[in-house]
Amino acid sequence: MKKSDRQNALAVAAVALCFMLTLGLCYFLGGEGFLLAFNQSEGEVKCYLLCGGSYENVTLARNAAELAKSRGGAGYVIVGDVSEVVLAAYASYDDAQSVLDGGSAGTGAYIKEVTVGEIPVDWAPKDMREAAESALGYYDIVFDCLYETANGIAADSLTVADARTRVAVCRARVEEMRSDFSDASAGSDDARCTELKLALVTALALIDNVALSDMYGSAAAVSSLRYQCVQLVLCREALYGVLAG
């Protein structure tokens, strides 16, 4: 066999071995692992929406959403070809799958994958890129606050009063980020810069819309936090489409 042919054969064998190892690992981790390995491109950041079901009739979906809210679920309705009722958003697939496997989401529940990053900043002038990168960090800060606070109340490790304090601190941080980016991008007429500014303003509005009243009880507070968290994820998905598209 010629040296070049032998090298080609070794290369093919190496690729085949890597592929078989990947298949074996995915099989070990579960069937979903194989799909995720090939559907999730390198560098993409996903969020996972736990949906309680889908409905052809939007009225039925909204009725189901109200029931979900009464139990602490987000009860967010995504209207499309079918209407999907979202119960909660998760940064980790394993966390979403764990809840799904637990059965508390219902027999018709499933996981919906949403792409929220990575969002590049190469569209920005060099002297603004660091500020843009910092501003994009609003998402993780707000998501973590809403997610962890909702779980804390649900687990009785946080009171609604505690939640108000945490949310207020989060809002102050995002407001500072908004102000810093506004100063850094002053004079820029780039539409993508404007989109990022709007994303920061929207995040602040979502925080302001969280209903944390002792009057309505902990389930309502948890539901409100999860509802705004789902909205945050969908807004980030839209921003990703603009800045990374």
Feature map (PLM): residue ranges:
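Short S/T/G/P-rich N-terminal loop/turn motif that feeds into the first structured element of a domain
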Residues: 22, 33-34, 137-138
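Alpha-helical segments in soluble extracytoplasmic regions
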Residues: 127-206
